[in-house]
Each structure stands twice: as C-alpha cells, then as structure tokens.
Amino acid sequence: MQTPRRGWYLGFWGALSVYAAAFLIYSQAWAFAWDETFHLLAAQLILAGKKPYIDFCFPQSPLNAYWNAWWMSVWGQSWHVAHAFSALLTIGAVLLTADYFARRFPVPSWRLAGGVAVGLAAGLNARVFVFGPLAQAYGMCLFTLALAFRISVRAVGRSGWLLPGLAGLVAGAAAGSSLLSAAAVPVLLAWMCIYNRSGNRWLKSAAFTIGTAIAFVPVFRLFSLGPRQTWFNLVQYHVFFRELYWPETTRHDLEVLASWIDSGQALLLGLLALFGLLYVARRSGWAPALKAEFYLCAWLALALSAEAGRAHPTFPQYFLFIVPFVAILAGVGLYAISSRVLEPDRPLWPVLLVTALFALGLGETLYNRRDDIWWGRYKVLAAKIDQVTPPNARLYADEPIYFLTRRLPPPGFELSYSHKVNLPPAERARLHIITEAEVKQQVQSGSFATAFSCDDDEIDDLGLKSLYNQRADIGDCAIFWDLKAVGRPHP
C-alpha cells in the first residue's frame, strides 16, 4: 500500500506543478483581454494619486485595482506584474480546490487521484485559464472564494469567532473586488448558521458580518468622500448604462446562457457535478456534516450563477467563479460513475480520461484564439506613439495605449465605455464623464498632438485624415500626428 500512495503523492503535486508552470508562462506570454486594460489604467491612476470614483470614472469594485496598484508600486508599472500575481492567485484557488478533495473525500483510494482530477478540471477550464491571469478581478475572486469556502467549512466545527471573522473578511474581499462574487457572502453566512456544530452561532455570525464589513472599508471611505460618485459607479452605471454598448442585450444574454450547450467542457463538468450531487444526497451514506460541505458547493454554484446570469449584459467568463465548486462535485460524480463501471479502487484511468478531455477542450479554445490581439501588438503601437508625441503633449488614444505609454488620459477619457452616458452637464462633470459629441469637438479643435484609432468608422467620423499631416498604419490601427493649421494642442 505504500508504493501506490507515494506514487499518487508524486502524481498529485507533479501534475499540479506542471499545470502551474504552464499557466504562469501563458500569463506572461499570451494572456490578454481588452477589458483588463481599464483595470490596469485605474491602478496607474491610483499610483498617480487619483481616487476611483472621486477623480475618474471606474464602474467596478475598487479592491482589485488597489491590489494591482500596490504590486506595481513595488515591481513596476507593467502588465507582467499584474498578470503574475493574478496567475498566482488562480493557481492558489486550484490548489485549494484540489487539496480540499484530497483531504475530505471519504474514500481513501480516491483522495489524491480525485484531487488531481478536481484541480485540473478547475485549472484547465477554458474560462479560468484564459481570464484567470488577467488584471481583472477573476484571479482574486477565484482565490478568495475558494479560501472563504475552506475557512467556513472549518469554522462550523470549532468554537470562537476568529475563523468566522476570517471567512467573512475573505468573502468580503471577493465582493470588494467584483460584485459578481457578492452572492457568496449570504450563502456562506447562512450555511454557517444552519450547520454550526460548536460555539455560539450568533457570535460567529456577528464575527462573519464584521469581517465582511472590514473588507469594504475602501468602499466606505470612497463613499464618505463622494457618495454620488460611488453610487453611480457601483450601482447606477450597471443598472442603466451598461447595455448602451450592447444593442439587443436580452437576445445576447439568452445566447450566453445557452452557450454551455456548445461547450464540451461545460457539459462534461456539469453532468459529472449533477451525478456527484445526486450521489451525495441519495447513495453516499456519508455523515450529515460531510454531506453539508458538498451541499455548500452546490449552493455557492447556484447563487453565483444566478448573480452572473442577472448581469445585463452577461458574458460567459462571469460564470467562472462557480468552477471550483462545480469541480468538487464533479470529482464525486467521477467516483460514483467509475466505481460502478470499473474497479472502485483503481482511479488512474478515469482520472486520465477526464483530464485528457479537459485538456483537449482547453487546447481547442487556445487554438481558436491564436490570432487574437495581445499585449505584444500594443507595445509596438505604444512605441511608435511615444516616438512621434512630444512629452506632456495631449494624446487621443484608448486605455491600453495610455497605460503602456504612461501618459495620463485627459479628464473624461479614463474610461471609453462612459462616452454614451447621457446625464446633465453638472452631473457629468462631477462623475468625470464626457459625451461622444464632446470627444469629437475636442479632437476636431486640435486639442491632441497625436491621435490613435483602430476603428475605420471612428477615423472617418472624427476626420482624423484631414486633421493631421502624418500617418502611420500598423496592422489594423492608425497613428496620426503633426497637426495641420486647425489649432494647436492644449498643454
């Protein structure tokens, strides 16, 4: 019995180490999504002394932006830094998920093998792999949700307030990084109250609530400085203005909600999780306390899915927060099926088969993204823009260019997704928002020494070809400089 167990220990850590290395390499070489760029720009603005909401529009929870800003203050203002720490957080979430199964699954011969399957089912998930290492809050939320789950499971069997308070703090950190993860907070609190086995449940609930509140101190601070701005960025923008950039939003949302049918990974993971949940409820014979932990996975997955599904518009990556919890249930489902079809104490082949299927699904996703834009292309564009733009001159560009050139955007240009917001002028000024008409007026008045765009329609609408003497085309993008006699750029 010693040899296979030692072998599975090596396999457990070996497989997860190989995954972690590959994931880190991907994060530094190819990971990119356009939406991460305004998160990076927000971190850069924070380093310049500006406050989210108060000094610039940033319709996101602020904690992840402060996290990125802190690490960039130590290691430099580079997307490589943000990607590295997001990747490490995602790897941490995968390890927490795999380790939970390896420790808590009641069938000894399946603990380590199932842990490998569960960890790789989560880590090789296409959405987790593609979005986990980005500067957005995905990595932060994956890690804090997985950690809050682990702490909550431990807290119900122990007296005292420390573990519940820590669980609330970590769950609050997830919500403070992205409100898409906020649904986990009431689920964890309710579950701890219902299944508490030691100590005063009300004291624990109070500790959890206080911990959550502590995580929201940055939001409370910003609210005290600008309640109107904070309300707009965290609530009003999402309720009334997000859909401005997505026509036929309802149809789009329905297509996203049905897209799992076309995903082999989602189908496999979901079916295994469903079988796992049924096995826990009807066939396992496990102790009620252990069953409750797996039920918690189901409740978290359901609540987080509902939260992501009600976003308007929603996107497939919003659902990646459920992956660790669905993967745990899928590990149970894999055992339930394999133990009936194959030898119950020989998990090697089922684990290899499922891992291979998830790896193939990820491979297909990465192959389909092979021609997508990435940071290397923007670095070339930023270098040319720096070459032709005088220091401290005004630049008309988008978030990735502002970030890479380290040129602060003019007021109102910090978030390109805000120009369609239609509010009274005084409100727009308070919220640091300018309209598309105001953007056009500034560009055509000669306010910018250099202009950049990758959109032919925008180039024509702004009249950039007639405003500048010089033009350079790089890929699908164009850089304009050397203003004609229409005005001089503002200092």
Where is each model-derived feature located?
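Membrane-interface transmembrane helices that cradle and orient dolichyl/undecaprenyl
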Residues: 104-105, 109, 145-166, 193-196, ...
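Extracytoplasmic
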Residues: 60, 180-181, 185, 224, ...
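Transmembrane-helix motifs of polytopic, lipid-linked glycan transferases
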Residues: 84-108, 124, 147, 151
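Perimembrane helix-loop-helix junctions
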Residues: 184-213, 278-287, 328, 334-343
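Membrane-lumen/periplasm interface segments of specific transmembrane helices
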Residues: 204-245, 303-306, 310, 401
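Hydrophobic/aromatic-rich transmembrane helices and adjacent perimembrane loops
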Residues: 132, 138-141, 146, 183, ...
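Membrane-interface alpha helices of multi-pass inner-membrane proteins
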Residues: 118-119, 161-179, 185-190, 213-214, ...
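Short hydrophobic alpha-helices at membrane interfaces in multi-pass membrane enzymes
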Residues: 112-116, 151-172, 201-203, 292-301
